[in-house]
Amino acid sequence: MMNKDMLLHQHQQPQQDENMSNLTSASGDQASVSSGNITEASGSNYFPHHQQQQEQQQQQLVVPDSQTQKKRRNQPGNPDPESEVIALSPKTLMATNRFVCEICNKGFQRDQNLQLHRRGHNLPWKLKQRSNKEVIRKKVYVCPEASCVHHDPSRALGDLTGIKKHFCRKHGEKKWKCDKCSKKYAVQSDCKAHSKTCGTKEYRCDCGTLFSRRDSFITHRAFCEALAEETAREVVIPQNQNNNQPNPLLIHQSASHPHHHHQTQPTINVSSSSSSSHNHNIINSLHFDTNNGNTNNSNNSNNHLHTFPMKKEQQSNDHIMNYHHSIIPPWLAPQPHALTSSNPNPSNGGGGGGSLFSLASPAMSATALLQKAAQMGSTKTPPLPPTTAYERSTHNNNLTTTMAAMMTSPSGFISSNNNNHVLFQDYNASGFDNHGREEAFDDTFGGFLRTNEVTAAAGSEKSTKSGGGEGLTRDFLGLRPLMSHNEILSFAGLGSCINSSASDQLHPKPWQG
């Protein structure tokens, strides 16, 4: 019996163990399932909550934008057009006792305040009551001062207290004064606030003036800038007027040769030399006027004429030129514009442009000068019909002006092959007859030769006193004295013209009368 019980107990024990294991596994599975369900549930619950938080944050960000879109308060001085405009006198506006209590004689600015005060005295009082149907109109107040911007109803202020403060501060008596800048204020609080910042910051104008007040600085700067602009405009306008003055010589040439009017007029830009300041002053002191033949001082000739380089021997004769420049007749005075009145194409006549002197021609030696002069030669043109006396005299002045400019600066006597015939081309193309040509040559070269004789005599004395070395020039053939203008002209083939014109004066030809 006992053995059976033991066997049954042993047999039941594994079953119990198996059942326990099953229970444990089942519980474990349930636990795992439950834990998984909890995790899934928690996960499913977490994400929607997070999304809700994000949506709430986005809504909070949108709310300020909607709040800023609310209607703002009107700016001061921009009232509602439908508002009621009230104009008070200065006395009424500044009165402190408009409404007085008959018991204690206390004054009030508003009737509402007086009615509330009457309640304390057990007096009958009445407050204004508005019905719901009554249309409320806004009230605006204009400034009593006629010169004030707020006197206009369109710039009225919407508050009675505000208009009172405005009138008191801007137009009332200013009793309070700043000790630093002497600025006055009508309200003591404003003066105290100003004194805290007065002098702590400086405003400097471009002209060097210092200001402690910004408003004074702004006013001064506006005036200073306007004054500077006006001064600059006055300086620029006269220069433009001088630069735009037409050359009378060029005007006559363009009128005489209208078919060459389309040709451009190149300008001269020659670098000035310090040694040529004397000749520059001599040329500037003489101004040739082709209209009336008078000599006028040209104050603005520096804007049109540039000096040319001089050689050493020319510098030594500066005092001679200074002494004898008064000998030159007024009609031989060079026109500054004459330096640009030559013609680059001699075959077309004398109406074109061109430069008498090259852009950058250095000081030429005697040999180079003679070679250039030899290239000129003498030009032969067919006889042209005679012209009037006016054209003859005008072109005579033109030729005289050109020769004066050439003789003034011998270093730039001839600049290029394009200008070889510039001396006589305008003269030959102008339609002179033989008699007019001889008169022009005689008047022009006769005056220059007479002046040159005086200059040469003074130059010989100077060279003798200085040892004889200052009057020499270096060329390819060595040292030799400077050639006179007579030698240069005779070498260039012009001497015969001068001699013939001089002899014709003494012995006039039969056809000349």
UniProtKB/Swiss-Prot annotation:
Ranges where the record places region SHR-binding: 213-225
Binding site for Zn(2+) 1: C178, C181, H194, C198
ZnF endpoints (CCHC-type): 203-226
Renumbered ranges of motif Nuclear localization signal: 163-170
GO biological process, one term: regulation of DNA-templated transcription
GO cellular component: nucleus
PANTHER family listed in its UniProt record: PROTEIN INDETERMINATE-DOMAIN 11, SERINE/THREONINE-PROTEIN KINASE RIO
Function: Probable transcription factor.
MF GO annotations: DNA binding; DNA-binding transcription factor activity; zinc ion binding
Organism: Arabidopsis thaliana
InterPro entries (UniProt xref): C2CH-3rd_BIRD-IDD, C2CH-4th_BIRD-IDD, C2H2-2nd_BIRD-IDD, IDD1-16, Znf_C2H2_sf, Znf_C2H2_type
Subcellular location(s) per record: Nucleus
Region of interest (Disordered), ranges: 1-84, 255-280, 334-358
Residues engaged in binding Zn(2+) 2: C205, C207, H220, C224
Ranges of biased composition (kind: Low complexity): 51-60, 264-280
Compositionally biased tracts (Polar residues): 10-45
Keywords: DNA-binding, Metal-binding, Nucleus, Phosphoprotein, Repeat, Transcription, Transcription regulation, Zinc, Zinc-finger
Chief place of localization: nucleus
Chain positions of all zinc fingers (C2H2-type): 99-121, 141-171, 176-199
Protein name (Swiss-Prot/TrEMBL): Protein indeterminate-domain 11
Pfam families reported for this sequence: C2CH-3rd_BIRD-IDD, C2CH-4th_BIRD-IDD, C2H2-2nd_BIRD-IDD, zf-met
Phosphoserine carried by residues: S89
